[in-house]
């Protein structure tokens, strides 16, 4: 399975780059800027300008880059978006939550989000009660290096006030609803295997933040702050390239 996934990832990356390179000047500009980028980095002054593609603006260590959407994997819980950098880093997102990340010093190869609450459900409860009970759910993930398999973390989702200066561009901040998702102790996870796995990781990650917006009938996470290690945290934002006219 891992080999098939890897082959598909390489194939999609090649197809994406070939398609970009074979089209208009605007697409060639996108290809050039993607090729010039380092892992999750390129000059902030260079931004994608091709509205035919979907982009993700990512900030890691105060450096900005843009990833391109390669494809979406259908899933009963919502599509899994697969985003690529020019150096073949891969970021997977499902309903705004991190589904996987590869190509950095730390990787999350598999992430089970099947128990995560839907944002529509959370917003519905928030509309009925300004102070709803927090949602709790269990995330299971595999981390590399070290082959740490089956790391289970109970997470708690709660509303939060809007940050005073969020790193968001070209979005109406008044339309955003903010949530925090952090790890909490779970007295039910006392099995020997869970104790061993959680002892081996010895790390509680900083809380994640999500900015949610209603777009018609859809609820979309447009911005998030997430960490895969205490010292590896990044921000991402959905980015709309300007509409350009093509012949």
Language-model features: locations:
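C-terminal motif of bacterial Sec signal peptides marking the signal peptidase cleavage site
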Residues: 19-22
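Surface-exposed, glycine/proline- and aromatic-rich loop segments on solvent-exposed faces
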Residues: 108-118
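Bacterial N-terminal signal peptides that target proteins for export
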Residues: 2-12
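Surface-exposed helix/loop patches within compact recognition domains
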Residues: 117-141
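Acidic, serine/threonine-rich low-complexity disordered tracts
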Residues: 24-85, 89-102, 106-110, 135-247
């Amino acid at each position: 399975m891992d080999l098939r996934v890897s082959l598909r990832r390489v194939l999609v990356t090649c197809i994406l780059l070939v398609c970009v390179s074979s089209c208009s000047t605007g697409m060639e500009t996108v290809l050039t800027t993607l090729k010039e980028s380092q892992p999750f980095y390129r000059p902030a002054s260079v931004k994608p300008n091709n509205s035919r593609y979907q982009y993700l603006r990512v900030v890691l260590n105060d450096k900005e880059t843009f990833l391109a959407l390669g494809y979406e994997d259908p899933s009963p819980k919502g599509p899994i978006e697969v985003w690529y950098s020019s150096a073949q880093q891969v970021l997977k997102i499902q309903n705004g939550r991190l589904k996987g990340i590869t190509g950095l010093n730390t990787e999350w190869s598999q992430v089970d989000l099947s128990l995560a609450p839907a944002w529509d459900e959370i917003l519905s409860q928030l509309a009925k009660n300004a102070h709803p009970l927090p949602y709790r759910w269990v995330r299971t993930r595999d981390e590399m290096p070290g082959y740490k398999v089956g790391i289970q973390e109970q997470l708690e989702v709660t509303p939060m006030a809007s940050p005073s200066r969020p790193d968001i561009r070209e979005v109406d901040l008044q339309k955003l609803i903010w949530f925090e998702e952090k790890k909490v102790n779970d007295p039910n996870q006392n099995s020997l295997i869970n104790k061993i796995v959680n002892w081996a990781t010895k790390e509680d990650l900083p809380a994640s933040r999500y900015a949610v917006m209603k777009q018609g009938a859809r609820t979309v996470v447009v911005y998030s702050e997430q960490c895969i290690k205490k010292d590896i945290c990044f921000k991402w934002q959905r980015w709309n390239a300007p509409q350009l006219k093509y012949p």
